[in-house]
Structure formats: structure tokens, C-alpha cells
Amino acid sequence: MSKPIRVRYAPSPTGLLHIGNARTALFNYLYARRHGGTFIIRIEDTDRKRHVEDGERSQLENLKWLGMDWDESPETHENYRQSERLALYQQYIDQLLAEGKAYKSYVTEEELAAERERQEAAGETPRYINEFIGMSADEKAKYIAEREAAGIVPTVRLAVNESGIYKWTDMVKGDIEFEGGNIGGDWVIQKKDGYPTYNFAVVVDDHDMQISHVIRGDDHIANTPKQLMVYEALGWEAPEFGHMTLIINSETGKKLSKRDTNTLQFIEDYRKKGYMPEAVFNFIALLGWNPGGEEEIFSREQLIALFDENRLSKSPAAFDQKKMDWMSNEYLKHADFETVYALCKPFLEEAGRLTEKAEKLVELYKPQLKSADEIIPLTDLFFSDFPELTEAEKEVMAGETVSTVLQAFKAKLEAMSDEDFKPENIFPQIKAVQKETGIKGKNLFMPIRIAVSGEMHGPELPNTIYLLGRDKSIEHIKNHAIRLYRSPLFLNALRS
């Protein structure tokens, strides 16, 4: 009988939730839910120098926002933070010391740096050289006594089996192996401050919590042989490992960097801009995995049912912000109005645009939104001065028939009564201009759209004109003429 599936996401509270870490959490979540396993959150807070206040809360809040839930965490279980488990780590460090599988090291940082410099100058691969090599028992005792008398606090190092072979069959990469002699020598498992190092603590935690599968990024591959050494030293069975490929920037082809300003890389950014969490969840799930086929829009339940670890990609996952925004637009277009309005409302309120037209404006621009915060620039037309035209828009408005179209349409608007001024009655007026002037297609619609809204593309033109209002639409047409045309006859005709 196979052992129960237990997986974990173990963030460090050192900042906001990055898209890469969110993917690690999400794949562990999908794997657990797909196979009826247990999903665990554990906080790895042993790096006190990088600890950020509220970092843990931020991580958990953003995971919840994405729609993930978990079975065990610091919220429900004691000692699920590494800082609460120091006594347990010390127990196993003492065991390794007693068994001669680890030892206290008194070498200083300055000595380590000098040795590293010597090795590099000699063209050697930097590695720790056991400080006790060649010492007799008496010399070793004297060395330790002198170091302790000088107030030097030791670290604890694991004694590495240099001839050992450390291998595993990776869930993603296949067979991987490392030689013990290529690890860099005996490595520190306990720092001078008494805290364990990552590669020691994570093994104790995973064993204690009975983790069956460790699914993480492939930047952890180099950590795996060190962790296997700890499993070997303590006589424990190691879990299965799966290392997901890197996430790269689709535009540069390089590893996603926090300096890539063309991407939103933190989940907090998506929350603040008003993305739907379901869209972000869907997008992240397809970074390095796909269920096959052409379909790309999946609900959470569908993703759980479809998730297959055997389809995790061996090639880097390309992060494409345009693809993310396309997917977000798909979700917003098909979401119910109440959901989208709730996302847009805070932005409208902050901008002082929560007027009687607010709901109509959201309804008008809902098909265009990629994120809820876009409702502000999209609705500038209704609350700000007429926008400056682009060169492409100016080129359209320099057409020979533009003045004819605008004069005719302005006259139609002026002739409409307040009672008749409705979206369903505006389109017939445009068609009437077509019939009167013989001008049709883009030559008809584009000048009207640009003159009224200042844009070549947008929502349905009659709805835009209706929400803008008859008087303001007429004003925009007049102002457009004043800006771009210098023909006295044309200006007089528009102003009459």
C-alpha cells in the first residue's frame, strides 16, 4: 500500500508573494487535491536577517486570495514555524555530534575567505577543507581550547561522505545524481547563532511532517544532494522530489528578474490592480504544465481534475504578460456584472467618479477591461478634457470627407430631442448621415468616433455618445474642428 500523499509549501516571510513561489504553492495544492492528499503550509523563518514584518501574513493572505486552502498550517497547528522548532533541530544535531557524523567547526569567516581566495587563485574549485586534518587528538583538543578561549563561537558541520553517490529519480527531470566529492566539502548544518541552516532544517521538518513529495523550483536541485546526505546520516527515508523548470521572461528569454519592468511579478500587484483571482490562478497553473489540447481557460475544479504531474514541462516556462492580460480580459468579459462592478468600484470612488453613470460606464467598458483599474483611463473622456490625438488619429481626421461627415452628424445630434436621445436612436442618425452624404464604412464611423471620444477604437459608438451626453458630444465635435481645421467656412458651419 502506498504511503499517504502529503505535500507542503514552505515560504520564507521575507517579502511579497512572487509569481514563482505562487506557482510552487499552486502545483503542490493541485497535486494534493488531485490525489486526495494533504496540503501543508510551513513557515521557514530561520533566516532572521531577511525576516520582514508581516511577511508571513502577506504570504498567507495572497494564497487565500488566489483561492487556495490548506489542511495544516501555523494557523491550525503548533510548531509549524521553524523558529518554534529549534529544540527539535538541536535534538538531531546533538545526535549527529554524538555519532561522529557531524562536528563543531571553529574556522572564522576571515580564514574561510582567505582559503577561498587562495583556491580561486590556484584555479581550484572553492571548497571547505576540514580544519582538523592532520591533527592528533592532543593538537585538536588544544586548538579547540584556544579557539573557545578567544571567544570564537563554532558552527556545526556535517561530515560528508566524499565517495558517496547521491541520486534520485526526479518527478520532472528524470534520473539525477551527484558525487559527494563535488558538494564543496563538509557543510554547515548549524550557524553560530544556534539556528539550523536551510538544508538541515528542511529535512527534519519534512521527515517530522511525513512529507511524501517535495515539488519545488529547479533552483533547488543543488540543495537536494545535501538534503539526501542528512537523510542518510539520520537513517531516514527521503521523499520523492520534483523540480519544476525556471520561469523565463517571454520577451528576453532570460530568467524572470525583479528588474523586468514589463511584467507584474507579485500577487499583491494583481490584487491592487483589480485582476480576478480566478484568472491569475488559471494563468499560473499553465506556467510549466498543460493538460493537452488547445483550451486555456479552466476553472479551479477543472484544473484539479486535470492535473497530471507527468505533464510538467521539462522546458522553461515563458511568462508572457500579454497572455496574462488576455486571459484576465476573458475572465472579466464573461464574469457577471456585479463581480466586475465590485472590482471597479474602489477605483471609481478614489477618482471621484462614483456618479449616477458609474454602473453604465462599467457596463460599457467591461468587454475591454484587462484589470479593474483600467476603468479610470478608459473613462477619462467623461470626466476630463478631450485627450490629445495621436498621429494616426490626426491622419484619419485630415481626410477629405471628414468635415462633411462631422457637419452632418452635428446637425443630426442638434435636431434630436431630449426624449429621443437614446442609444437605440443614435445609430439611425449615423446611418442617415451615410445616406445623405454617400460616405460609409471607416470614412463614416472613424471620424465620428475620434471627434467624440478621441480614440480610434472603443465600445459601441452609440452607447459612448449617449453616456457622454448630447451637449458634450456636440461640444467635442466643435472643439475638434477648432483644433485641427482652419477653414473659416467649415468652422462657421460647425458653430452655426
From Swiss-Prot:
It is found in: Cytoplasm. It is an enzyme of class 6 (ligase). One of its GO terms (molecular function) is tRNA binding. ATP binds at residue 258. Pfam families: Anticodon_2, tRNA-synt_1c. Its EC number is 6.1.1.17. CDD domains: GluRS_core (cd00808). InterPro entries: aa-tRNA-synth_I_cd-bd (IPR045462), aa-tRNA-synth_I_codon-bd_sub2 (IPR020751), aa-tRNA-synth_I_CS (IPR001412), aa_tRNA-synth_I_cd-bd_sf (IPR008925), Glu-tRNA-ligase_bac/mito (IPR004527), Glu/Gln-tRNA-synth (IPR000924), Glu/Gln-tRNA-synth_Ib_cat-dom (IPR020058), GluQ/Sye (IPR049940). It catalyses: tRNA(Glu) + L-glutamate + ATP = L-glutamyl-tRNA(Glu) + AMP + diphosphate. Monomer. Belongs to the class-I aminoacyl-tRNA synthetase family. Glutamate--tRNA ligase type 1 subfamily. Catalyzes the attachment of glutamate to tRNA(Glu) in a two-step reaction: glutamate is first activated by ATP to form Glu-AMP and then transferred to the acceptor end of tRNA(Glu). This is Glutamate--tRNA ligase. It comes from Streptococcus pyogenes serotype M49 (strain NZ131). The gene is gltX.
